[in-house]
């Protein structure tokens, strides 16, 4: 069963509605007991990195989430700030991330040459898979997704990058490390492209 982690941040209902349209059952988990037994996990998130990490830590679900993902190797998909939470740390805050995909979250304007770039990066952008992955099955060419963010994932090792987009520089907009996946864009706002990606995740 796919379970969506509801720790108070993220457009939970949008994901539930999309999976309903795909005729794929999901459960919204608000407690550790509700999250237990998940065979796939979606970790959404919006807002600031530290606020998201603090809310997750306070939710009572951090321990079971760590156990499911790290011990039982349950596939997890972090979305938007949920992807950023997979990193070790962020320019945006002081709290440590989950550290499941080694890397740091950087602000576009902190990159030399991008000090004056408009933030946030908002709207549709091309997404180019850089390696073959089941997450992007059927999305290998001409895929476009909706973005809304001012920070991006800088992988410690380029092998963790699944797909890239360009906004002043080429950046990793999708990452993976074994059973851990993350996407910076919003599949729930990306129409057929997003539905395809969420269906693909259900089949990983």
Curated annotation (Swiss-Prot):
Statement: the UniProt record of this protein carries the keyword Transport: no
Keyword annotations of the record: Amino-acid biosynthesis, Cytoplasm, Glutamine amidotransferase, Histidine biosynthesis, Hydrolase, Lyase
Active site residues of this protein: 80 (nucleophile), 186, 188
Enzyme Commission number(s) from the entry: 4.3.2.10, 3.5.1.2
Residue span, Glutamine amidotransferase type-1 domain: 1-204
Keyword Cytoplasm carried by entry: yes
GO CC terms, sorted: cytoplasm
Domain of life: Bacteria
Catalyzed reaction equations: 5-[(5-phospho-1-deoxy-D-ribulos-1-ylimino)methylamino]-1-(5-phospho-beta-D-ribosyl)imidazole-4-carboxamide + L-glutamine = D-erythro-1-(imidazol-4-yl)glycerol 3-phosphate + 5-amino-1-(5-phospho-beta-D-ribosyl)imidazole-4-carboxamide + L-glutamate + H(+); L-glutamine + H2O = L-glutamate + NH4(+)
Disulfide bond positions: none
UniProt cross-references to Pfam families, sorted A to Z: GATase
InterPro entries assigned to the protein according to its UniProt record, in alphabetical order: Class_I_gatase-like, GATASE, Imidazole-glycPsynth_HisH
GO BP, one annotated term: L-histidine biosynthetic process
UniProt-annotated location(s): Cytoplasm
Pathway terms, separated by semicolons: Amino-acid biosynthesis; L-histidine biosynthesis; L-histidine from 5-phospho-alpha-D-ribose 1-diphosphate: step 5/9
An example Gene Ontology molecular-function term: lyase activity
Function, as annotated: IGPS catalyzes the conversion of PRFAR and glutamine to IGP, AICAR and glutamate. The HisH subunit catalyzes the hydrolysis of glutamine to glutamate and ammonia as part of the synthesis of IGP and AICAR. The resulting ammonia molecule is channeled to the active site of HisF.
NCBIfam families: IMP_synth_hisH
Subunit architecture: Heterodimer of HisH and HisF.
Name of the protein this chain belongs to: Imidazole glycerol phosphate synthase subunit HisH
Underlying gene: hisH
């Amino acid at each position: 069963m796919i379970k969506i982690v509801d720790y108070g941040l993220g457009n939970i209902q949008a994901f539930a509605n999309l999976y309903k349209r795909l005729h794929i059952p999901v459960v919204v988990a608000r407690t550790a007991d509700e999250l237990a037994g998940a065979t796939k996990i979606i970790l959404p998130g919006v807002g600031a990195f530290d606020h998201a990490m603090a809310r997750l830590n306070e939710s009572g679900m951090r321990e079971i989430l760590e156990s499911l993902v790290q011990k039982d190797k349950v596939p997890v998909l972090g979305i938007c700030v949920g992807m950023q939470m997979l990193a070790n740390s962020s320019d945006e805050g002081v709290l440590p991330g989950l550290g499941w995909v080694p890397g740091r979250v950087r602000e576009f304007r902190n990159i030399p040459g991008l000090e004056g770039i408009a933030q946030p990066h908002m709207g549709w952008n091309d997404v180019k898979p850089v390696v073959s992955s089941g997450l992007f099955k059927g999305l290998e060419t001409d895929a476009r997704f909706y973005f809304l963010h001012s920070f991006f994932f800088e992988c410690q090792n380029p092998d963790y990058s699944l797909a890239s987009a360009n906004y002043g520089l080429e950046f990793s907009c999708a990452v993976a490390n074994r059973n851990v996946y993350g996407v910076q864009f919003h599949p729930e706002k990306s129409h057929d492209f997003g539905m395809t990606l969420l269906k693909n995740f259900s089949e990983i």
